[in-house]
Amino acid sequence: MSRVCQVTGKRPMVGNNRSHAKNATRRRFLPNLQNHRFWLETEKRFVQLRVSTKGMRIIDKKGIEVVVAELRARGEKV
């Protein structure tokens, strides 16, 4: 399972760790992904999405029905 948010599309990015001596070593910054079940009232069932916490805020703002409709329009299976 890839580390990609289904709502926002956030994915891991790369950068550097910096020590006190300013030595750079490569590292990955991972998105804060959560597996979360959302209740779809129109379909009377739960859908499980892998979303970042930013994605959860978007769902709170727009509503799960709108977000699921956008996912289906993009061709994602929900």
Swiss-Prot record:
SUPFAM superfamilies: L28p-like. It comes from Shewanella amazonensis (strain ATCC BAA-1098 / SB2B). Keywords: Ribonucleoprotein, Ribosomal protein. One of its GO terms (molecular function) is structural constituent of ribosome. The keyword 4Fe-4S does not apply. The keyword Ribonucleoprotein applies. Pfam families: Ribosomal_L28. GO terms for cellular component: cytosolic large ribosomal subunit. Residues 1-21 are annotated as: Disordered. GO terms for biological process: translation. This is Large ribosomal subunit protein bL28. Belongs to the bacterial ribosomal protein bL28 family.
